[in-house]
Every structure is written in structure tokens, then in C-alpha cells.
Design a protein with these regions (language model features):
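Conserved P-loop
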Residues: 2-114, 118-124, 132-136
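P-loop NTPase motor core
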Residues: 117-186
């Protein structure tokens, strides 16, 4: 390829970082004025937008919400994120926030589909929050220990290495993605 034929990718990757209650979610939510946001909500931060005086009601129609109630005992965020990033349509259940949830499929429970392969130049994947995704990875790695209620067992170096590899896979895919990505962290 000749340099004069190269076209720079328009997709942007942004990290919004700050302490709690500093306006991160509100700032990202305002992108809905011009873009369609696909909001992966791991910490219930979307409530901030529902009560924000700066968030216009007409913008809310541009936000597709995927509630992923991630907890220590049920680290759904990491598995769901990995499945979403594989591409193809993933149906995120409203009850558990799990991609293609077997329990919810059996009962015809509601879900919201997501297919990052179909994202265009006006789509933005919002990950709220990277902090929770990192915790989810460690909880996933230590799930057998946690299921035994052994809360005194601290992660060892191998656990941190596994966590790093999982997060590296996720962020390398996001870095190369042909769509916009906004990560919120604290």
C-alpha cells in the first residue's frame, strides 16, 4: 500500500478516568446527542444518567443498555464481554446480564441483542467500568475458592498473570476495533 492511498481509521478509543461522582458517566452520556451508545453497565452507573439535569430525554433513545449485574460470586461481566467481542449476535438477558443465558432462553425471558460486527461509524461501545471488569476477571479466576467461602485466600502471582492475559485479550480487540470505544474507570 502506498502512503498516499492510506486512509486513517476514524474509530476513536477513549478512557474517561476520575474519582467517584466526578461526572464521568454524565460526560459519556452526552455523546448520545450524536452517536448511538451501546452501554455495558457493570456497576449500575446508568442511574446517574436517569437523574442528570444535563441529559436530554431525546438522547436517551440513542442509548442501548446492557445491564450486567456483576458480583463476586457471579462474575458475569468477564464471560459476557469475551462473548460479545467474539462477534456475531449475542443476546444479553435482562435478568442475569449473561450472553445467551440458557436459563432465560428456556423461559423466554427478555433480552437485548448486540452484534459488534454490525457497528458502524456512529456506534460507540461504552464499557462502564473497566475497574469492575478487572475485578470480574479475578473473581472468575478464583471462583472455585470463593464458592468454598475461603475469603482468606489471596490471589497469587499466577492469578494476576491470568487476569492480565484475559484483560490483554479484551483490550487488544477493543484497540483494533473499527468502531468507537469509551471505557470508564475509577
Amino acid at each position: 500500500m502506498k502512503l498516499d492511498t492510506y486512509q486513517e481509521a476514524a474509530a476513536r478509543k477513549i478512557l474517561v478516568y476520575g474519582p467517584p461522582k466526578s461526572g464521568k458517566t454524565d460526560l459519556v452520556g452526552r455523546l448520545a446527542e450524536k452517536y448511538k451508545l451501546h452501554w455495558l453497565d457493570l456497576e449500575d452507573g446508568i442511574k446517574t444518567l436517569l437523574h442528570s439535569p444535563r441529559m436530554k430525554k431525546e438522547w436517551m433513545g440513542n442509548i442501548e443498555l446492557y445491564k450486567i449485574p456483576d458480583t463476586q460470586m457471579t462474575p458475569a461481566a468477564i464471560e459476557t464481554m469475551l462473548r460479545i467481542l467474539k462477534g456475531g449476535t449475542q443476546n444479553i438477558c435482562h435478568t442475569h446480564g449473561i450472553a445467551n443465558c440458557v436459563k432465560c432462553k428456556a423461559t423466554d425471558a427478555p433480552y437485548t441483542p448486540i452484534n459488534i460486527s454490525s457497528f458502524g461509524p456512529n456506534d460507540v461501545l461504552v464499557l462502564d467500568s473497566v475497574s469492575q471488569l478487572s475485578l470480574s476477571a479475578m473473581n472468575y479466576i478464583q471462583r472455585e475458592i470463593l464458592l468454598k467461602d475461603n475469603f482468606d485466600k489471596k490471589p497469587d502471582w499466577d492469578d494476576y498473570a491470568k487476569q492480565g492475559r484475559i484483560l490483554e485479550r479484551i483490550f487488544s480487540i477493543l484497540q483494533a476495533a473499527p468502531f468507537h470505544v469509551v471505557c470508564i474507570s475509577h
